């Protein structure tokens, strides 16, 4: 299990993990390189390929734990990581189930989706910051940073009304509200939805129907390609996190899905 864009494992994920552990599943919850409790330099820099490698490393680490059946691994990801898990599970025969929560699965669709809730000026400022960040990183200098979440009208990766307050409500002690700006350029080039058709394991996709951050239509298309079980929630992107109206339902649906497909898994937890 891992978080989305700029997230850390102590920021709203532990309640999901503890629910899975209580249901008899073994849980390995991790931070990406350069974030939270994980090592790596530079800090707060998102590499989509690097995060995918981190998922693959976590799968190997989980498979090596005592008592774990290495042929029955599960992937869980939320937001940006909801796309990572599709890519990580594709073309593997050791994955027993996948849970993709409010997933970001199509960068171009997300960019078009953003035009409905952001002014052209806001989008231009974020893109300009990303371009400057890319140029600076290629020169070998320290990354250009931007907030993960900010208020509407400010520069940030997520600037929708309420996004700052929503993220702060789940933020753990290791979370930092900054991220390397060049990720804004990388996001638009990725389409993990294409990997959904190559996921052979049972797949649960949990969609927030009024999601202003991750396009729900793109998530639904990916779910169809992956022959997924789909759960819809009449809410926005952050409303499936702990303390929000639809968290309990999303958590319980995921638990039921995993128990149904992993009924023989034994109990331990490392959250």
Where are the language model's segments positioned?
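Gly/Ala-rich beta-loop-alpha elbow adjacent to hydrolase catalytic centers
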Residues: 77-81, 85
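Alpha/beta-hydrolase-fold enzymes
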Residues: 84-167
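Conserved alpha/beta-hydrolase "acid-adjacent" motif
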Residues: 212-218
């Amino acid at each position: 299990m891992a978080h989305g864009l700029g997230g850390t494992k102590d920021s709203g994920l532990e309640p999901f993990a503890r629910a899975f552990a209580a249901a008899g599943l073994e849980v390995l919850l991790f931070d990406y390189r350069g974030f939270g409790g994980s090592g790596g330099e530079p800090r707060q820099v998102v590499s989509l390929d690097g995060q995918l490698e981190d998922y693959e490393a976590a799968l190997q680490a989980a498979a090596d734990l005592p008592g774990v059946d290495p042929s029955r691994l599960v992937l869980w990801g939320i937001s940006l990581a909801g796309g990572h898990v599709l890519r990580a599970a594709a073309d593997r025969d050791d994955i027993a189930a996948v849970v993709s929560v409010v997933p970001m699965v199509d960068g171009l669709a997300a960019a078009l989706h953003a035009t409905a809730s952001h002014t052209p000026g806001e989008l231009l400022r974020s893109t300009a910051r990303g371009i400057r960040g890319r140029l600076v990183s290629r020169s070998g200098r320290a990354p250009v940073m931007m907030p993960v979440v900010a208020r509407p009208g400010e520069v940030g990766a997520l600037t929708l009304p309420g996004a700052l307050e929503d993220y702060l409500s789940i933020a753990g002690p290791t979370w930092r509200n900054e991220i390397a700006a060049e990720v804004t350029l990388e996001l638009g080039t990725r389409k993990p939805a294409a990997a959904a058709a190559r996921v052979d394991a049972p797949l649960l996709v949990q969609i927030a129907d009024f999601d202003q951050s991750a396009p729900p239509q793109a998530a639904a298309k990916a779910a169809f390609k992956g022959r997924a079980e789909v759960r819809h929630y009449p809410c926005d992107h952050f409303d499936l996190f702990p303390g929000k109206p639809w968290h309990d339902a999303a958590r319980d649906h995921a638990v039921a899905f995993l128990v149904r497909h992993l009924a023989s898994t034994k109990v331990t937890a490392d959250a």
